[in-house]
Structures are given as structure tokens and as C-alpha cells.
């Protein structure tokens, strides 16, 4: 069956956008707020009509993720690119662990559904919602292991709010990983279809 590289590339960009947010937060304590909102919002999209709808109404909302995907596909084994690649591969691995634990998947769905009550009173990017998303990551995803080692500024990473945002961004990466599998993504494509993914990401960036 022919693969839909448009959908696969969008989902990969979602994973990469989360990785970039984690990197920005860990080193600087702040990040691209528009990209963060896009990623956090994707967690709540449990019944989207299509792949793009998970993230928004236009490919431009994934511009940071598409740029990061190009970086990852061209990554050296050292430096910031290697760090982004490690985060992306770690998220993919954790998503596979989650898929193998039906109870964890059910719990994840239930916990996300419970956010509706809080979202009636708090903004998506509020400390309350971000902390709730972080708690879901800690309670449901972290126990599946192996834990993702986040590297950055030790002083920055001691900040509780930064920690919560990092975990919320990681949860968004898991959500994108689930989507990636659903649309036919696989790690083999990162080796054998790299050029097709790169070309698609470039095309999407050009039109975003």
C-alpha cells in the first residue's frame, strides 16, 4: 500500500516541534509560545477529521517542527542537532512502549478527557493546565521507561514551571508519535525514505 508521506511528514513535524520546545525550555527557560500552544492543543484532539486538524488549520503552525525535521534528517552526531535527534527517537520509543500497554493507553485517554473541566476555567497555557499535562506525563508515560534524559542549563531545569512545560511538551511529542504510527509512519522510513521525507518537509515549508 502506498504511504501517505504528507500525513507522515506532518506527524513527524509534530514530534520534532515537541523536541525543539524541550530543547529551548531546557537551555533558555522559555520557548516559542505559538509553537507551544500548537503542540499542547494537539494533545486534546482525540477525534480529528484529518492529520492536519490535530495541529491546526494550516501547515504554517508546524513551521518550527518542519524546520527541526529538516535539521534532524541532516543531523550531525554532535551538537544541537544530535540532541534533537535523540529527543525525537526517544519519543518514538516511548510511544511504542505506550502502544504495548493497553491499560496505559486507556488511562491516558481518561486523563486527557478529564482536562475539559479545567479548560472551562483556565487557559491552555496557564500554569494549572500545563501542570496537569505534566502530571499525566509523569503518571502515565514515565513509568513505561526508559526515561528521556533532558539536557540543558542545570539552573533552568531546577525551575518547577520549566519542568512542567518540558513534560507537557514531551506529552505532546507522544501524541504526535501516536499519530505518526496511525498514518503509517515507521522508523525504517527515517533510513530508507529519508529523501522523500526531506523533500516533503521542504515543500510544506515553502508553502507555509
From Swiss-Prot:
Gene name tied to this protein: hflD
Entry's localization field: Cytoplasm; Cell inner membrane
Which HAMAP family does the record associate with it?
HflD_protein
User: What residue intervals traverse the membrane?
Assistant: none
Q: Which Gene3D superfamilies match?
A: HflD-like
How does this chain sit within the bilayer? Peripheral membrane protein
Protein keywords: Cell inner membrane, Cell membrane, Cytoplasm, Membrane
Q: What does the similarity note say?
A: Belongs to the HflD family.
The intrachain disulfides are: none
| Organism of provenance | Edwardsiella ictaluri (strain 93-146)
PANTHER family, per the entry: HIGH FREQUENCY LYSOGENIZATION PROTEIN HFLD
Output the Pfam families linked to this UniProt entry.
DUF489 (PF04356)
Q: Know the name of this protein?
A: High frequency lysogenization protein HflD homolog
Any one cellular-component term (Gene Ontology): cytoplasm
